């Protein structure tokens, strides 16, 4: 998984996530509101520390709004598919 910085200013930070097949991120959390845009869409699995899986389908060319995670919650992102997923994330500060 690669994170490519796009821009940062006093109001927002943006990056492109490139998620090759069968790769995963480290455990992390999202403390801010964010918009996610599918550049090359696909099904991305989030896995909580207790092993619970949630699959989110990101469609190419579509934008998604996500709220901050509840306090103390973490997850990792896993691409269990056979294709690379590319997402642009714009996180509000």
What are these regions (language model features)?
Residues 1-27, 31-36, 89:
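A short glycine-rich, His/Asp/Glu-containing loop-to-beta-strand
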Residues 8-11, 51-70:
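Short acidic-glycine-tyrosine-enriched beta hairpin
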Residues 14-16, 44-46, 66, 87-89:
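Short hydrophobic/aromatic-rich beta-strand segments that constitute the beta-sheet cores
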Residues 17, 25-30, 46-48, 55-57, ...:
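Short histidine-centered beta-strand/loop micro-motifs
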Residues 21, 40, 59-61:
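Short, flexible surface segments
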Residues 22-25, 62-77:
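Histidine-centered metal-chelating micro-motifs
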Residues 30-50:
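Glycine- and acidic-residue-biased ligand/ion/polar-headgroup-sensing regions
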Residues 70-92:
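Ligand-binding loop in jelly-roll beta-barrel domains
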């Amino acid at each position: 998984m690669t994170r490519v910085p796009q821009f940062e200013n006093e109001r927002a930070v943006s990056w492109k996530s490139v998620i090759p097949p069968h790769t995963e991120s480290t455990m992390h959390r999202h403390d801010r509101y964010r918009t996610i845009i599918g550049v090359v869409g696909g099904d991305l699995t989030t896995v909580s520390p207790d092993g619970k899986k949630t699959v989110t389908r990101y469609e190419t060319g579509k934008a998604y709004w996500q709220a901050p995670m509840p306090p103390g919650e973490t997850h990792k992102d896993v691409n269990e598919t056979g294709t690379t997923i590319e997402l642009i994330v714009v996180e509000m500060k």
